[in-house]
């Protein structure tokens, strides 16, 4: 029974993770190819908010959050049948991260785990979630490096989980999820070491982008 419930959780979580929020929102909400029109950088995000406003950004993030919450909740409900809801949620987070980073339908060319794993940490434990969020925000606002903030937050997720969570399988799954996040950011790590990583700053006035 447990193996069957884990299998269902894995399939659903991986499937939802592998769905591209960019492509989905392009077709359902914005009716344009936002991946092509608005690249994931300073200028692209600035132009996106300028064109679609805060409501457009909220719709995009809401869709991304819903896509993450469904497998997390389902994993907890299914494994809750055998009194292991915590393992089900952690397993869903891990499988969802795999789907995001290695989506088979996009030839294993994935996207970012930042929101999905961020929400997943609160399912592991509120203390884990808040500690992870605080570290992410602190490192980001101190350095403006999103990749560095993600890596620091991931390390904090692991540390607090090891300190606060008693279930061994949950700890293992969190560590495996962290491994996926580090693999996702392997190129960013290299750029950080070489000092070539770009900082992210949102600015309402985008005229500076065209300065010589």
Label the predicted regions.
Residues 129-131, 146-154, 165-177:
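Loop-to-transmembrane alpha-helix initiation sites
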Residues 1-10, 72-91, 122-128, 161-173:
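Helix-coil boundary and interhelical linker segments in multi-pass alpha-helical membrane proteins
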Residues 45, 49-52, 75-78, 95, ...:
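Interfacial segments of multi-pass membrane proteins
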Residues 5, 9, 13, 18, ...:
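Alpha-helical transmembrane segments in multi-pass membrane proteins
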Residues 56-59, 66-105, 127, 136-137:
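Nucleotide and nucleotide-moiety/phosphate-recognizing core
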Residues 33-42, 104-118, 145-156:
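Short, non-helical or kinked segments that cap or interrupt transmembrane helices
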Residues 24-57, 190-212:
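Cytosolic, membrane-interface loops and tails of multi-pass inner-membrane proteins
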Residues 12-26, 59, 97-107, 140-145:
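Transmembrane alpha-helix interface/packing and boundary motifs in multi-pass membrane proteins
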């Amino acid at each position: 029974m447990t193996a069957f419930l884990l299998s269902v959780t894995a399939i659903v979580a991986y499937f939802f993770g592998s769905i591209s929020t960019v492509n989905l929102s392009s077709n359902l909400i914005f009716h344009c190819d936002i991946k092509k029109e608005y690249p994931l950088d300073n200028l692209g995000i600035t132009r996106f908010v300028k064109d679609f406003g805060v409501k457009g950004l909220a719709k995009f993030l809401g869709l991304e959050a819903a896509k993450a919450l469904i497998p997390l909740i389902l994993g907890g409900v299914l494994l809750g049948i055998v009194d292991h809801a915590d393992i089900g949620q952690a397993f869903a987070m891990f499988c969802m991260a795999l789907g995001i980073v290695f989506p088979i339908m996009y030839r294993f060319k994935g996207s970012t785990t930042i929101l999905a794993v961020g929400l997943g940490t609160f399912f592991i434990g509120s203390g884990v979630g808040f500690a992870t969020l605080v570290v992410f925000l602190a490192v980001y606002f101190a350095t403006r490096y999103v990749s560095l903030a993600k890596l620091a937050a991931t390390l904090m997720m692991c540390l607090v989980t090891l300190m606060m969570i008693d279930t061994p399988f949950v700890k293992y799954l969190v560590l495996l999820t962290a491994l996926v996040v580090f693999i996702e950011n392997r190129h960013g790590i290299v750029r950080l070491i070489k000092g070539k990583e770009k900082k992210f700053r949102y600015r309402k006035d985008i005229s500076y982008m065209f300065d010589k």
